[in-house]
Amino acid sequence: MVKFTVQAAALAIIGASVAQGCTIPKGNAATIDLIAEFEGWRPDIYLDPVGKETVGYGHLCQRPRCAEVPYPIPLSVENGKALLSTDMAGAENCMTMATGQNVVLNANQYGALVSWAFNVGCGNVRSSDLIKGLNRGDDANTIVSQELPLWNRGGGVVLPGLVRRRAAELALFKTATGDGALPAPGC
């Protein structure tokens, strides 16, 4: 029997994208730092609110005692960020594949939206008015400024942590850089 995991699905999609010649951009250091800030840090294995083993910056363990983690536990901060960078692959793939070739984003804009995708999930990203607006050719600064702050609820309730996260993502989105991210070559 094949065991399905979100990470396996993300890797399968990434593999298919790469096989087609698509180069998925990686989130930059500012992206990793932003996600790390809001995911929180735990160097030792702990149980998340639904009882799943978790470690580092919210890495959901796939095997007992996080046996798949290639770093010694307790994690160092450096190894925790390396693990987070690997975990971000699904959100990076999602953001790259959800946007059309007409969408031009610099590395900070892309990173802000990768953080959002990491938090809300790819299904929500793909069906969002934010992505529809970007793909329609709406001004990126306008559509993101209007739509991103609306993603501040959990269970129908405005959560202060999500309000802060969206504000930080928007600040990163508006931070200029000469480094490009999208459109990605071959995607």
Kindly label every feature range from the protein language model.
Residues L47-P70:
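Substrate-binding/active-site groove segments that recognize
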Residues A30, V50-K52, N108-Y110:
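Extracytoplasmic
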Residues M1-G21:
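Fungal secretory targeting signals
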Residues V18-D44, E78-K81, S85-T86, G123-C187:
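Long, amphipathic alpha-helical surface segments
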Residues L34, T54-G56, A112-A117, I143-E147:
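Structural recognition of the beta-strand scaffold that forms the well-ordered cores
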Residues V69-Q101, A107, G111-V125, A140:
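Alpha-helical segment that forms one wall of the substrate-binding/catalytic cleft
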Residues R42-P49, V104, G121:
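Catalytic glycan-binding domains that act on GlcNAc-containing polysaccharides
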Residues E37-G40, Y57-L60, V120:
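Secretory/exported precursors with cleavable N-terminal leaders
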